[in-house]
Amino acid sequence: MFETLVEVFLGMTAGQLIKLIPSTLFQELAVETKVDAQVKKLSGEVMFKLIVFSMLNSNKLSLRVMETFLQSAQFKSFSGYDILESRYNSIRDRICTINAEYFEKLFASIFAIYNKELNEEKALTKTDSTYIALAAKLFSTGMENGDNNKRFVKYSVNLKGSIPSSVKVFTQQRYISEDVALSEVINENEGLKGNTVVFDRGIQSRKSFENFTDSGKWFITRSKLDIRCKTATKKEITNKPAGSTVTIISDEIGKLISGRAVVTNHDYRVIKATIDSSGEPICFVTNMLDEDVYLIASWYKQRWEIEVFFKFIKQHLNANFLVSRDENGIKVMVYMTMILSILIIAYKKINNIKGYKIAKLRFELELDSELIKEIVILCGGDPSKAAHLFSSA
């Protein structure tokens, strides 16, 4: 259904990695989205570079931090713009009013570049959601979720291979249901056609299963143990491979029956197993009727990679802190978080770095070295004479 990926990377500096993004992309999308219409100072490209630079160089991002960086020599060198003067309130207003579609399209374009660079075009997709909590007195339009003093912003992500391929931000109460939120994220992602997506028990709606199958999207999920299935075929269980962490008990194909006794049009596969380490029973549901049963179980196990991704962006990219409480501003910052995560994850994989913390630190240091080299050249010097100072090996 999709290829097992073989990672063979020769290494790449942070500067080389960023240069994979065409310099013309910013202007092309600016024209397409009209992001710079009637704007003199804080163009879409400047805002993109300011947010990336500020996220990399600050442990807790704020508008004041961004204002300080905007006026710094380091950022002027990084962005290629010499004169940049704006107050924090101008930055705030720009984030709140800038066309978020510009950043959405940048995210989609940048994903496509690095998805190909990482050889992950046919990789498995994992889908899940996470929340950001805000004080109710500061953000009244978010979701309620059991705490009257807080409101929540939810964003749902498709993680294709190791990097995010799409994201949606939700603030309306009906999206508290994963059946609604995750189903929408999967249904709207045309790139999932002919590919496989894995998600947890958040989606149980038979209608969602039918929609995925109708649109040619393969899925694997976990279900309740008492799922109702009108069994038509009992498949023979294949030999358990070495390294498997579950033992398959049954493997059946049939039509699912909803709580209202509605029978699905398509056949689905219900796989029951036990987790070897705990003896806990587990049930999988999929519309992949022919794949090896233990292979399906191993693919479902990869779902945990998106939990690791959420932990990474919250711990190292400050995804829990919102610079803007305006819905448009929140979308801009979420798209930018996704873009920066792509850069760091790609850098980590290409250079075979184990931890996210060290990958982010080395990425930052290499960009600093690039800035120093540019300053040396501007002053008439030759950075190659001190090449040993710029080595991150």
Model-derived features with residue positions:
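Active-site-proximal, Lys/Arg-enriched surface segment
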Residues: 90-159
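Single, function-defining residue in the core of a domain
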Residues: 1-63, 102, 121-122, 130, ...
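Short coil turns linking two alpha-helices in DNA-binding domains
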Residues: 84-87
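"Short basic amphipathic alpha-helical interaction patches in structured regions
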Residues: 65-67, 140-143, 213
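N-terminal, well-ordered alpha-helical segments
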Residues: 48, 52, 64-68, 89, ...
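A generic secondary-structure signal
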Residues: 69-73, 113, 184-188
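DNA-recognition alpha helix
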Residues: 61-80
